C-alpha cells in the first residue's frame, strides 16, 4: 500500500468532529422523537442532511489540513456508504422476521448506530495499529475482505426467512434475561408487574412464560442485539476497506462515523426501493474484491 498522510490526533480536530456528530444526532433525535413511520420523502431529506453534515466536515478537513487529506476522507466515506448496503439488507431481514413496525425501526437503528460508534473506534484503533507489525498484515486484511465477497456470492437468498431464534445474540440475551414474546410499545425491557398486567388481557391468555424475573426483554431488544452483532461482523469488511484508503486513525474513524450516522435514513430509502435495487449487492461484491486487490497491490 502506498504511503498516505498521517494527521494524528489534534484537540481542535477532535473537538470539531465531536461537535458536528453530537449536533447532528441531537437534531435527528429531536425530529424523530415520536414513534411514527418514516416516509420515503422524509428519509430522503434526512439522508441528504447527513450527507451535508459529512461533507461539511470534509470541508473542514480540506481547509484545516490539505486537499489530499480531504480526498482520503471522502474516499473512505464513499467506501463505507457503499459497503453498508449489504448490512442494511441484512437488517431488513431481521426486522421482517421479528415483525417490527416501521414506527419502531428508527429506535432500534438509533441505538444500533450509537453502539456502532463505540465498536468502530475499537476496530479502527486495532486495525490501524496492526499495520505497525509488518506488511503481511495487509495480506491478512485482503484475505478477510476477499473471503467476505466469496461468502456473499455463495450465500443463499433466503429473502429474510432465516430463523433468528438460532442467532447467537438471541441465545445470549435469552440466557441472561427472561423474554416476553410480544412488543410493548417501543420498550426494550418491561417490568414483571407490567408483564403480569399484559397477561391478564384476553389476547395474551395463550402466552406462557418459560422463565420469570423482575425484568423481561422484548422482541425489540432481541432485534437490537442481533442488529448490533450484525454490525460488528460487518466491521470486519468495512474497516479494512477504509484502511485501504488511509492508515490514519482519525481520517478512518471520522469518515466511517459520518457515513454510519446517515445509515438509519438510508435504510428507509433502501427498504422502499428494495425491488428496484437488485444489482446493489453484486456491486458491493465487486467493490470488496477491488478493496482486497488494493490492499496487496
Where do the PLM segments sit?
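Multi-pass alpha-helical transmembrane bundle typical of ion/small-solute transporters
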Residues: 1-297
Amino acid at each position: 500500500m502506498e504511503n498516505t498522510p498521517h494527521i494524528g490526533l489534534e484537540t481542535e480536530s477532535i473537538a470539531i468532529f465531536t461537535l458536528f456528530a453530537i449536533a447532528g444526532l441531537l437534531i435527528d433525535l429531536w425530529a424523530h422523537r415520536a414513534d411514527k413511520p418514516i416516509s420515503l420523502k422524509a428519509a430522503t431529506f434526512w439522508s441528504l442532511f447527513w450527507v451535508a453534515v459529512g461533507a461539511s466536515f470534509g470541508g473542514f478537513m480540506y481547509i484545516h489540513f490539505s486537499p489530499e487529506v480531504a480526498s482520503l476522507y471522502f474516499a473512505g466515506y464513499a467506501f463505507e456508504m457503499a459497503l453498508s448496503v449489504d448490512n442494511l439488507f441484512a437488517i431488513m431481514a431481521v426486522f421482517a422476521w421479528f415483525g417490527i413496525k416501521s414506527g419502531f425501526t428508527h429506535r432500534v437503528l438509533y441505538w444500533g448506530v450509537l453502539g456502532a460508534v463505540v465498536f468502530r473506534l475499537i476496530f479502527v484503533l486495532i486495525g490501524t495499529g496492526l499495520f505497525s507489525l509488518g506488511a503481511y498484515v495487509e495480506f491478512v486484511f485482503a484475505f478477510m475482505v476477499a473471503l467476505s465477497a466469496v461468502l456473499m456470492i455463495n450465500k443463499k437468498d433466503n429473502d429474510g426467512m432465516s430463523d433468528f431464534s438460532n442467532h447467537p445474540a438471541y441465545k445470549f440475551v435469552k440466557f441472561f434475561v427472561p423474554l416476553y414474546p410480544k412488543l410493548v410499545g417501543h420498550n426494550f425491557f418491561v417490568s414483571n408487574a407490567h408483564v403480569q398486567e399484559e397477561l391478564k388481557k384476553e389476547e395474551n391468555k395463550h402466552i406462557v412464560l418459560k422463565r420469570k424475573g423482575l425484568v423481561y426483554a422484548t422482541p425489540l431488544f432481541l432485534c437490537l442485539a442481533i442488529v448490533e452483532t450484525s454490525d460488528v461482523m460487518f466491521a470486519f469488511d468495512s474497516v479494512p476497506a477504509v484502511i485501504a484508503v488511509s492508515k490514519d486513525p482519525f481520517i478512518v474513524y471520522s469518515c466511517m462515523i459520518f457515513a454510519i450516522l446517515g445509515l438509519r435514513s438510508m435504510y428507509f430509502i433502501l427498504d422502499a426501493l428494495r425491488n428496484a435495487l437488485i444489482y446493489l449487492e453484486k456491486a458491493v461484491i465487486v467493490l470488496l474484491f477491488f478493496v482486497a486487490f488494493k490492499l496487496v497491490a
